[in-house]
């Protein structure tokens, strides 16, 4: 029996990257999964992957910047599966730039997506979990939400907010049987990274050059992050709440971090 057998999970941004890998892993571990995403083409592809592997899932279109759509995603999960045991607030954007390089529109969009999106989906799910007497929320933070990052003023700010929102929710709802933790990934390869590769570089050469700046000599994979999310979502972390689990290849272990 899987580690999430009998559980229902709602995952925002479950159409690609860490969200997609987590949705597939959760389903493989026995959870029924609702994938909430803006890109329904990719979400449907994730759904097909899960169903082909023998899992159970569904999809719903959701822009986490809109509170009413987050409520709709929770309601749809309840209608389809009957409960909400796990919420993985994964949807987010990663713009680069210092304060001087960041436009007001980008600043507002980052906060709306990364911070308000986490707030909205949690706010919609918490009453359900309180009524159930149990629930787990996992927020996708970042190692740059713990130490800050070069040329990532808006992103680091948003993830720092997610880190403290995680701790605050954990304190507020611990006595109601609800645990709230955050995963803090370091640099993790996702397909959109390919646009940053120089034309003359092979993918292997580029990945090798990126990894040289990390203590472990490589960047992470989405599957590695998904396994850490699974730990936080499962009963294996039953005595953990309000914690930030950093999975970054040792990048934040010392006094400096990788620069871009």
Predicted regions and their residues:
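Conserved glycine-rich cofactor-binding loop
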Residues: 8, 15-16, 39
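Substrate-binding pocket helix/loop in short-chain dehydrogenase/reductase
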Residues: 98-99, 106-111, 210
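Active-site loop immediately N-terminal to the catalytic Tyr-X3-Lys motif
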Residues: 100, 147-153, 175-176, 217, ...
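Active-site helix of classical SDR
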Residues: 122, 158, 166
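Alpha-helical segment proximal to the catalytic Tyr-Lys
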Residues: 127, 171-175, 238
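Residue(s) in the substrate-gating loop at a strand-loop-helix junction
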Residues: 142
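Short C-terminal tail/terminal secondary-structure segment
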Residues: 230, 241-260
């Amino acid at each position: 029996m899987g580690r999430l057998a009998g559980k229902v999970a709602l995952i925002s941004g479950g159409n690609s990257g860490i969200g997609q890998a987590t949705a597939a892993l959760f389903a493989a571990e026995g959870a029924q999964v609702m994938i909430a995403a803006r890109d329904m083409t990719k979400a449907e592809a994730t759904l097909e992957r899960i169903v082909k592997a023998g899992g159970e899932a569904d999809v719903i279109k959701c822009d986490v910047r809109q509170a009413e759509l987050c409520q709709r995603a929770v309601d749809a999960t309840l209608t389809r599966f009957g409960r909400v045991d796990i919420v993985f607030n994964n949807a987010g954007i990663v713009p680069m730039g210092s304060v001087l390089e960041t436009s007001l529109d980008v600043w507002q969009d980052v906060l709306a997506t990364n911070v308000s999106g986490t707030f909205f989906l949690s706010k919609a799910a918490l009453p359900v979990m309180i009524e159930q007497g149990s629930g787990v929320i996992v927020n996708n933070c970042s190692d740059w939400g713990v130490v800050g990052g070069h040329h990532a003023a808006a992103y680091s700010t948003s993830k720092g907010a997610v880190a403290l929102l995680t701790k605050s929710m954990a304190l507020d709802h611990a006595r109601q049987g609800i645990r709230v933790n955050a995963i803090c990934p370091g640099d993790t390869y996702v397909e959109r990274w390919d646009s940053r590769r120089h034309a003359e570089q092979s993918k292997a050469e580029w990945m090798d050059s990126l990894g040289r700046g990390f203590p472990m000599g490589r960047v992470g994979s989405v599957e590695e992050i998904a396994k850490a999310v699974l730990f936080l979502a499962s009963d294996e972390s039953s005595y953990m709440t309000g914690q930030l689990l950093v999975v970054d290849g040792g990048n934040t272990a010392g006094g400096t971090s990788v620069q871009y």
